């Protein structure tokens, strides 16, 4: 017979917060345990209750702030603390960015044994209404009056009860209640678990995941919402290949512009694109400035997606090669190059975790390389990248630990210097750390 799990004590207890974790939780010590406290900041005294407790580590949440820290602010969103979409709204935006910068530098030190020669100024933008890509949870809850649409609760798998979301682009963030009513009126309100949000500059799309067939009346209802909202509506009964258009009131592809580089990039609802258009524009500008591509040079863009960096690079370089593992994005990159009239760029599909020197794209050497890998990093391809001879590498990262690991490899094994690094606040009010680093060969160009 298994051991019974001990019940957590329900009584609040008072503690002093001494630090802040990488995830934005307060750190304290209580009952001979390291305690991570949701909603607490360094220097505060708070009353908290346990949410999880193990032998040496425990978690808790704040029920009362006894003495607040100077950087504490009132959360903008009334759902903060319950909704799991944000974790840092109680912290000033400036301090949020400082936290992310410190996380990056700590990871460089601990994971890579390196430090940048120069810290880049953080890229920041509008803190609200920035999010263009999201996966919204949906739950039919008759006892709460219908269908809930939003993010899941911080401390449970339930969907948070929310009427709006201020971090979402208002084209969707102001329509959560409307979306709930829409689904409630379908014949299968309990069989629609998710809505995928994909927004471009002027157009947008919602993909309704349906686990049972929609009736003709359901499709008419969804089409009516599309006409009223101006957003294209899709249904998806199975995997991504089953996605089918219900109605597009605009009849234009999803796309976004990079005005500083004279390109527009089209995409489909299921494609990967950056969630924050303002930061994405600043990120592309900074990456190209740091690469410092000169006329006549060849550039390699690894993990290139649909051409977010590739096409702007093609405006400056003699030749650009983009390599991506997802074939759908490779095709999108080619389409985008054609639409933008760029004939000096080639896209290849390849699994970059199995990079080998005999790849058709890995020929001729490159003057510059841009890396934009997933959270798992680019470790497997670094040896090949170094062998291709680029004097400068710009690495765009969504995982500070893997960036730091890869930085250590480039510096200690392959003879590069980490000349600069800094953060980009792609996800304000969350603990997500996006960053950029520049590597230079010891021989100056």
UniProtKB/Swiss-Prot annotation:
In terms of PROSITE patterns, this protein maps to: SAM_MT_RNA_M5U, TRAM, TRMA_1, TRMA_2
Q: Which segments constitute the TRAM domain? A: 6-64
Could you confirm whether the keyword Iron appears in this record?
A: yes
**UniProt-annotated binding residues for [4Fe-4S] cluster:** 77, 83, 86, 165
Protein name in the entry? 23S rRNA (uracil(1939)-C(5))-methyltransferase RlmD
Going by the record, the broad EC class of this enzyme is transferase
Question: Which keywords does this Swiss-Prot/TrEMBL entry list?
Answer: 4Fe-4S, Iron, Iron-sulfur, Metal-binding, Methyltransferase, rRNA processing, S-adenosyl-L-methionine, Transferase
Q: Which GO terms describe its biological process?
A: rRNA base methylation
Active site, per annotation: 398
- Known EC number(s)? 2.1.1.190
Catalytic activities = uridine(1939) in 23S rRNA + S-adenosyl-L-methionine = 5-methyluridine(1939) in 23S rRNA + S-adenosyl-L-homocysteine + H(+)
UniProt family annotation: Belongs to the class I-like SAM-binding methyltransferase superfamily. RNA M5U methyltransferase family. RlmD subfamily.
Q: Name one GO molecular function term.
A: RNA binding
- The UniProt annotation places S-adenosyl-L-methionine binding at 274, 303, 308, 324, 351, 372
Provide the disulphide bond pattern: none
* SUPFAM superfamilies listed in its UniProt record: Nucleic acid-binding proteins (SSF50249), S-adenosyl-L-methionine-dependent methyltransferases (SSF53335)
Record's function text: Catalyzes the formation of 5-methyl-uridine at position 1939 (m5U1939) in 23S rRNA.
């Amino acid at each position: 017979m298994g051991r019974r799990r001990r019940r957590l004590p329900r009584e609040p207890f008072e503690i002093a917060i001494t630090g802040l974790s990488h995830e934005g939780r307060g750190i304290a010590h209580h009952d001979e345990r390291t305690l991570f406290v949701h909603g607490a900041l360094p220097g505060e005294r708070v009353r908290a209750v346990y949410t999880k407790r193990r032998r040496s580590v425990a978690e808790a949440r704040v029920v009362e702030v006894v003495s607040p820290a100077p950087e504490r602010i009132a959360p903008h969103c009334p759902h903060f603390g319950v909704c799991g979409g944000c974790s840092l709204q109680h912290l000033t935006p400036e301090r949020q960015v400082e936290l992310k910068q410190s996380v990056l530098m700590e990871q460089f030190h601990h994971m890579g044994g390196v430090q940048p020669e120069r810290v880049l100024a953080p890229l920041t933008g509008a803190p609200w209404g920035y999010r263009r890509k999201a996966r919204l949870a949906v739950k039919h809850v008759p006892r709460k009056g219908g269908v809930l649409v939003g993010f899941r609760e911080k401390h449970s798998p339930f969907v948070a009860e929310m009427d709006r979301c201020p971090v979402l682009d208002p084209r969707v963030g102001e329509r959560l209640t409307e979306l709930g009513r829409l689904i409630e009126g379908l014949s299968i309100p309990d069989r629609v678990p998710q809505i995928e949000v994909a927004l471009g500059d002027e157009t947008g799309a919602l993909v309704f995941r349906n686990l049972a067939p929609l009736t003709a009346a359901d499709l008419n209802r969804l089409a009516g919402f599309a006409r009223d909202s101006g957003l294209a509506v899709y249904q998806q009964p199975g995997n991504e290949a089953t996605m089918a258009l219900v109605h597009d009131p605009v009849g234009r592809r999803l796309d976004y512009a990079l005005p500083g580089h004279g390109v527009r990039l089209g995409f489909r609802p299921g494609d990967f694109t950056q969630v924050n258009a303002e930061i994405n524009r600043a990120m592309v500008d900074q990456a190209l400035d740091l690469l410092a591509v000169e006329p006549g040079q060849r550039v390699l863009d690894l993990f290139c997606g649909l051409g977010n960096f590739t096409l702007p690079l093609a405006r400056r370089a003699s030749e650009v090669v983009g390599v991506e593992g997802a074939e759908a994005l490779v095709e999108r990159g080619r389409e985008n190059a054609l639409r933008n009239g760029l004939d000096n760029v080639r896209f290849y599909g390849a699994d970059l975790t199995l990079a080998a020197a005999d790849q058709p794209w890995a020929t001729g050497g490159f003057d510059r390389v841009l890396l934009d890998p997933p959270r798992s990093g680019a470790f497997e391809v670094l040896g090949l990248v170094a062998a291709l001879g680029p004097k400068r590498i710009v690495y765009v990262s969504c995982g500070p630990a893997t960036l730091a690991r890869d930085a250590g490899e480039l510096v200690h094994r392959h003879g590069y210097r980490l000349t600069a690094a800094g953060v980009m606040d792609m996800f304000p009010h969350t603990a997500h750390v996006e960053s950029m680093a520049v590597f230079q060969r010891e021989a100056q160009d």
